[in-house]
């Protein structure tokens, strides 16, 4: 059976049958099907033509329906949503339905249309004029009387939900005005009709690198996320994606989502089209409607931000649309935990997400402090073992196996963990990765200001724009603005490396080069990232410098563990010194030794 084309007038198409109208070809397709409708094709053609919208007769009319969070405008052509705008708490108005000035009402696929797929009606009702049946502050109702041979009355009711300002309740009623019963849907696999949303979700975040739109649906307590970039029309059925037996389906961008939920059993959904312009529809299963009876099916439509509290209040399970990581569930849970803490700081301490980020950084640094202290001690112990390690290298030469064995014995004897200094950095990597996603895609940070020039924590902190663009690797789109936070972050990292203990009295040239280039490389990588992430890294680096300054690590010689070697000599312990001061003292001692060696050398030559 061939799905109907969207054309319902006498327009001809450029194909081998171009001499015949689209409706005539649709009629032939239905005659050849196994279960055609029991109506006369000629009468159906006349009835559809009578429904067609003619702008010359009267222009389309628009009707508004508003809530505290939504501004909706409906057109009487198709009884569809012409404009849908979400009102954000900061006063911003974000349209989710694009405007198309100059385009006739019946030529654009506006959302919330009806489709009778393998019926003579097809989507003809979307190009037909409906009558305004009733209107109040929060409810609007459209109706259409179908002439012979269809004999039906269809009513579409739109109402703002009383318990949620971002939820639109939709009811579609089909009244059979025939003298006998009728079946909507040609066979068991055929839907009665479908309520559609198209085209896509236009939420103004298309420039966001992580704003790839997704189809999300819930099937038997399992959520599926499907990137719309993978949509591909299947030649066997014309669909791009079929989603059987689901509870709800959603189209999600980075910050906004449109979700449709069926309030009846046996719902399914499908998607048609290409990634740039696709249509998603919720299907009503095949039903028999007795003479004079009415079939009513209810839907809920959520139009709003991808924000946990708003999604959770809409209906159970919709909050699962919020997902930062689709492949690693533990990272998604961790990222949501970070967002929860940030929201708590915002709601409980100060209503500024910039300060919430600073508080989170302090919390993470405090939690990591014991490991940081242990890591610093481990690095200092490694520093003091450097002479003995050099001695082992000289003794074993090129025998790597023997050298590794001797090194491990030395570590064990002196109680040193060679990886201890790396643990704090490794443990912070999940935090960094999680916050990278949170700051770039969480709705809470969209347009959230901090101080001064930082007006959007989800975007780079452009102090001013450059009159040119510099193509720099690892910066995505190059450098076209002066972003201050990553520069300050790089300077703070340079200062931090100056305070880090080295692995020996004289730093390895490769290590020195790495320590010099790392701040520069990191600043370049983070240059065009969200300012919220750069604020976190800058604050963490500064706190690390403060920690290093006040942490005093004992400068005593490392003694073997009791029972492994001689016991430490008794006596007064040397006064603990900051490891940076101790390193500087050692450098001064080495310089003095070099000067003494030079003097001895000159004295020896004089005697000769």
Predicted regions and their residues:
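Terminal, Lys/Arg-rich, intrinsically disordered segments and adjacent short helical elements
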Residues: 1-45, 208, 373-420, 467-476, ...
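Membrane-protein biogenesis/insertion across secretory and organellar systems
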Residues: 1-362, 366, 560-608
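Conserved catalytic motifs of ABC-family nucleotide-binding domains
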Residues: 434-494
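Hydrophobic alpha-helical transmembrane segments in multi-pass membrane proteins
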Residues: 356, 369, 373, 417-437
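Residue-level signal for the membrane-embedded core of alpha-helical transmembrane segments
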Residues: 358, 426, 430-433, 521, ...
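Membrane-interface starts of transmembrane alpha-helices
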Residues: 349-356, 360, 480-485, 511-514
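Residue-level recognition of pore/gate-forming positions within transmembrane alpha-helices
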Residues: 361, 365, 425, 540-541
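Hydrophobic alpha-helical segments of integral membrane proteins
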Residues: 330-349, 385, 407, 453-454, ...
């Amino acid at each position: 059976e061939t799905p109907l084309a969207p054309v319902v007038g006498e327009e001809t198409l450029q194909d081998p049958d171009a001499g015949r109208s689209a409706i005539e070809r649709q009629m032939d397709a239905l005659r050849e099907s196994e279960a055609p409708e029991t109506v006369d094709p000629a009468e159906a053609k006349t009835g559809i033509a009578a429904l067609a919208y003619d702008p010359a007769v009267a222009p389309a009319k628009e009707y508004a329906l508003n809530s505290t969070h939504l501004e909706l405008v409906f057109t009487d052509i198709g009884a569809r949503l012409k404009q849908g705008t979400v009102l954000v708490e900061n006063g911003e108005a974000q349209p989710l339905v694009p405007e198309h000035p100059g385009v006739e009402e019946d030529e654009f696929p506006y959302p919330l249309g009806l489709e009778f797929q393998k019926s003579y009606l097809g989507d003809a009702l979307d190009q037909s004029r409906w009558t305004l049946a009733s209107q109040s502050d929060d409810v609007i109702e459209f109706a259409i009387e179908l002439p012979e041979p269809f004999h039906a009355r269809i009513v579409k009711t739109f109402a703002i939900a009383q318990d949620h300002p971002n939820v639109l309740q939709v009811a579609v009623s089909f009244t059979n005005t025939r003298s006998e019963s009728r079946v909507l849907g040609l066979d068991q696999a055929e839907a009665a009709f479908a309520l559609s949303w198209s085209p896509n979700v236009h939420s103004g975040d298309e420039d966001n690198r992580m704003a790839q739109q997704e189809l999300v649906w819930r099937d038997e307590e399992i959520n599926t996320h499907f990137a719309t970039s993978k949509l591909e029309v299947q030649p066997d059925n014309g669909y791009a994606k079929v989603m059987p037996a689901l509870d709800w389906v959603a189209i999600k961008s980075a910050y906004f989502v449109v979700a449709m939920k069926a309030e009846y059993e046996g719902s399914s959904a499908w998607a048609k089209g290409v990634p740039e312009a696709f249509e998603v529809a919720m299907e009503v299963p095949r039903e028999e409607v007795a003479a004079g009876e009415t079939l009513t099916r209810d839907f809920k439509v959520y139009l709003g931000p991808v924000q946990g509290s708003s999604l959770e209040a809409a209906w159970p399970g919709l909050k699962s649309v919020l997902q930062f990581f689709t492949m690693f569930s533990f990272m998604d849970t961790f990222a949501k935990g970070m967002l929860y803490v940030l929201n708590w700081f915002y709601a409980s301490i100060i209503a500024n997400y910039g300060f919430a980020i600073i508080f989170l950084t302090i919390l993470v640094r405090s939690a990591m402090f014991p490991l940081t202290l242990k890591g610093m001690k481990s690095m200092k112990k490694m520093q003091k073992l450097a002479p003995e390690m050099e001695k082992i290298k000289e003794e074993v030469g090129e025998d790597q196996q023997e050298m590794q064995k001797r090194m491990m014995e030395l570590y064990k004897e002196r109680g040193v963990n060679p990886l201890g200094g790396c643990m704090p950095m490794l443990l912070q990597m999940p935090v960094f990765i999680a916050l990278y996603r949170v700051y770039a895609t969480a709705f809470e940070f969209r347009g959230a200001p901090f101080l001064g020039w930082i007006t959007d924590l989800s975007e780079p902190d452009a102090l001013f724009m450059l009159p040119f663009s510099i193509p720099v690797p690892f910066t995505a789109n190059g450098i076209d603005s002066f972003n201050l936070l990553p520069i300050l972050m790089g300077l703070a990292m340079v200062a931090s490396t100056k305070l880090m203990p080295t692995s020996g009295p004289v730093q390895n040239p490769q290590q020195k080069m790495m320590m010099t280039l790392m701040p520069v490389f990191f600043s370049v990588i983070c240059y065009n990232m969200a300012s919220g992430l750069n604020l976190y890294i800058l604050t963490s680096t500064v706190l690390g410098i403060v920690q290093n300054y006040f942490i005093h690590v004992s400068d005593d010689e490392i003694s073997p563990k009791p029972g492994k070697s001689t016991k430490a000599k008794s006596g007064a312990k040397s006064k603990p010194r900051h490891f940076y001061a101790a390193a500087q003292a050692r450098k001064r001692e080495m310089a003095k030794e070099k000067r003494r060696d030079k003097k001895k050398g000159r004295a020896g030559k004089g005697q000769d």
